Amino acid sequence: MLPTLVLVGRPNVGKSTLFNRLTGTRDALVHDLPGMTRDRHYGRGRIGGKPYLVVDTGGLEPVVKDGILAEMARQTLQAIDEADAIIFMVDARAGVTPQDKVIADRLRRVTSPVLLAVNKAEGMNRAVVTAEFHELGLGEPLAISGAHGDGIADLVAEALAPFPEEEEASDDFGVPKIALVGRPNVGKSTLVNALVGAERVIAFDQPGTTRDSIYVDFERGGKPYVLIDTAGVRRRGKVFETVEKFSVIKTLQAIEDANVVVLVLDARENISEQDAHLAGFVLETGRALVVAINKWDGLSAEQRDDVKRDIGRKLAFLDFARFNYISALKAKGLENLLKDIEAAHAAAFIKLSTPKLTRVLEMAVEQHAPPKNGLFRPKPRYAHQGGKNPPVIVLHGNALEGLRDDYKRYLESSFRKAFKLQGTPLRIQIKEDEGKNPFEGKKRAPLSESEATRMRRKKRVRRKVYGAD
């Protein structure tokens, strides 16, 4: 599983700015008002051969007993307990504050490594600016600037030092490894029990990690599956005696480790921002996806229409996924759900031959040629498969850097229809390996003496005829 870095610190020390720097995005809301990051935000990053997850917490205000700031602090404490490494951020310009001391006291009791990052240190002497932060007792402070990127590479390298480089992804078709994800109380626990059944549970902690994610082997209809259970710890013989809890870190890790993700939604609740964030993260990781709308029973026809409209409006970017309307409690719709899981798994690991891909590409171009972009019209010539889980299709041709996004979506749709790639994201990559100017980037060779003489002679003639160079 990918290591998880958790950013903690009091409000307004620059956690969201560092998050954006580490993930190359601007997903976290950045504002100068304390408390603007209300929920934990999460993303992926990479340094060298090491990918990682980043969780940006709300500001930790230990003195607040209730209200939204107390809820932010509670979520932060949960993230601290589950992190692989913690980056504790302080403000170089504000110095050590009483809140910093309280947070440091809490962090000294955790088992995960803690790195002390002194942010907003741009233009300042590093030795001087970090000196007073030694009193926090968290090791050597590291001066950084999230806004300017100073010291960020060293910070991340130190945080990831204990973790190995990413292993090459397997292309094996294997058994569907399913992660059920979703907000609390949408029915994940009930769905786990409905799918597995008490008599078939084989639960064990994943080796090599400190997580309490549970892997459950089960069979259904004679077919084997592996379920990654994020709904709560399940011990042998106590499958039904659990309280569902939501853990962002375990959920993100499960998505990374799965090859099919089932996003569970509550039909009686509107689609939330958290639902959309989870769906977007699944899309970003490239995992096959099936959506299960639970608690469908008991809704009127009018209510069902409202739910479908809400889904169509807020999850339109999941047009590749299949949607299942189920009742986990009454075990309705589960067979179709498993069929769609199988289909999504097969699509994610499909083998696509170069001749067939090229034939589909040629037919798509013949029906609708790429529009010109500037002086040249892009000319896709052939395609081959560049990866699985998700499938990657690499296009070759001339002037392909001019392919517009809408035309790439058209090609993606053509490939999906031809190969029935339902349930998995599809990546289109461009390889500009033909039709380039062979002299691009090369300097003109200096003129020989005779060439220079002829050039001067031509210039003299032009002056006599035209009166200028």
Curated annotation (Swiss-Prot):
Bias (Basic and acidic residues) occurs at 432-443
One GO biological process term is: ribosome biogenesis
Q: Name one GO molecular function term.
A: ATP hydrolysis activity
Report domain EngA-type G positions. Answer: 3-167, 176-349
Pfam families referenced in this protein's UniProt entry, alphabetically: KH_dom-like, MMR_HSR1
Q: Which residues form the KH-like domain?
A: 350-436
In this chain, GTP 1 is annotated as bound at: 9-16, 56-60, 119-122
What is the protein's name according to its record? GTPase Der
* Encoding gene (name): der
